[in-house]
């Protein structure tokens, strides 16, 4: 029986799920990060060792493949042995650079043309240091953690490498970037799930793991959550109804739109495209605690319209499906009846999701066929009915949404379920 281990490193903690896919059995453990740290690599490494220690010994000894997912855009510089030479720059840290400086290295619509991208952070470090030693390397969070297990320098996957300037359709970095002073620091890029190498003997012995256990190329946390859902057909999508609304659609065609933050990740023979609105559960919680949301939702008749026309932003600014940094919340008029008010908010959020999928299809993505729902809002049956009425495709709660489970699935099976005849790009 093959056991695969998926490790998910998020912003507030880490989780590990070991899965025996032959018997549908699994074991899960987790750790929480401190809110702040002066040494994030040490926090991550200690969390990695804690997770391995917490997995029962009889499970550990049967693990044959391991993969790690991490936060997209969180990167650090280290030497070839993996010793950090800088503090990491986190996913949401913008770098004060001129994006025009990156224009010769990536296409005009590339996801790396952002002040928070990994490439922007590498260029920022180059400006800060004056010159970077050619025997250093830039690694994403997941890459660096994998290095602790396999010991192979400069290894990444094409999901984490996208924001570093990697072009998945061409399967390479541009010649201009490779020939630049940054080229020596770039990683070798693998398909997610491909084995990079065996676990280091000392690590295997310390934690009671098989010396034949393979460490595989990883992915990002958001893609791992998509993999956990089981969606694998073009036209299938996952909507995450959390503090914000995040859409991910499996498409036969890659689409992009820098204005609204839409870009596409290669996923085997398909593309995973999507966008994220600022609207979501954060707006609902401004007005209702969770218990009240549940009780009021039960009183809504979804077959009758509220008559309200809201755009429920939590504060100024929207990014997708409408790019408008000055857009204000539209939450008036507010009726005295809280049931009607909540219905108006849910209808507004539903409209945002509807417009989002329409925007992806306007850009040329594969038509939407089915939605799997993740996040706290997935449990709201009335909201689901409103969404199904508006969007017009089957909607169901995703059977699994744990990123660590998706990464365990990636370690076990790679991207075999996503390979098709060919890739297209608009």
Swiss-Prot record:
Coiled coil: none annotated. GO terms for biological process: xylulose metabolic process. One of its GO terms (cellular component) is cytosol. Pfam families: FGGY_C (PF02782). The keyword ATP-binding applies. One of its GO terms (molecular function) is D-xylulokinase activity. Changing residue 221 to A: Reduced ATP hydrolysis in the presence of D-ribulose. It comes from the Bacteria. Its EC number is 2.7.1.47. Belongs to the FGGY kinase family. Exhibits ATP hydrolysis without substrate. Phosphorylates D-ribulose. This is D-ribulose kinase.
